[in-house]
Amino acid sequence: KTYKEMKQTLTTYQELTGGTPDLAPVNDGFPLSDPTAILEDLQNRMQQDFPALADLTAQTVQCDIQDVDAGLEAYSSPAFYMIPPIDALMQNTIRINRSSTADGIELYTTLAHEGYPGHLYQTVYSSLVCDTQTLPIRKLFSYGGYVEGWAYYTERISYEYAAQVLAEAEGSLGSSYPAALLCTLLAQQRDLQINLFCLLDLSLHYYGAEESELLRSLESFGLSEEQSERVYDYLRTAPAVYLKYYVGYLEMNALKKRAELQWSDNFSLLRFHRFVLEAGPSDFENLTKRLKQTAAKTG
């Protein structure tokens, strides 16, 4: 499935760009650069398609955003959300690794993944539902495909928000492409990157590919020898990490398509997102069963 998706994405990307993408300066001049302002913008743009946290709590969600200490940059992810203690759900933390997260659209979509409507928003929303409507013991269970699939799913949506930001500012970041197409291409680039890492992960840990084969594949996609070795080392020591993101994302999209068919004219992104969030972290088999139990009428 991941291989089929990669071929389809690559074909679409080549058709849109003519094989010569003009994306080099995309991080120069994006209208938003302050992380707090970016989170505020994301919260405003998501209102139409995502249920409000205010529907569940009168408390204000706080988020402390700081850069990763320079001494830890080499050992940290590009950014990460720190799950709050169970008795301090409103006190949230996001850390940004400036050595591997560029300003501009990359920072914007990264904060969407980690913050709104990604990890922070999903964690707080699902936790509030769990505390009041289901069983709190569910918090002890971990479903990486759901959590990271949701975060990557919302990251992909944030490219549409970024296009809106650019259009409102009448900017294209120096690219010859209009804002909407530019952000579509950047999203597809991201898909290709994550999908490639998934395929290489399977090649290494399931099919037993040699290091030289993986390095050759990475270099064929334009990575330097040093970058390729770094990616290989990560895949070798952290098997199946990227699969949580991309396969989870594919499953989330498949679930949305099922909801569109089942709910027909009563489908909306708001309803679908509420369904996923209220179901809470789960495996996709049970999410599908739960979806089949919902009525076609507006819920």
Question: What residue spans do the PLM features occupy?
Answer:
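N-terminal maturation segment of proteins
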Residues: 1-299
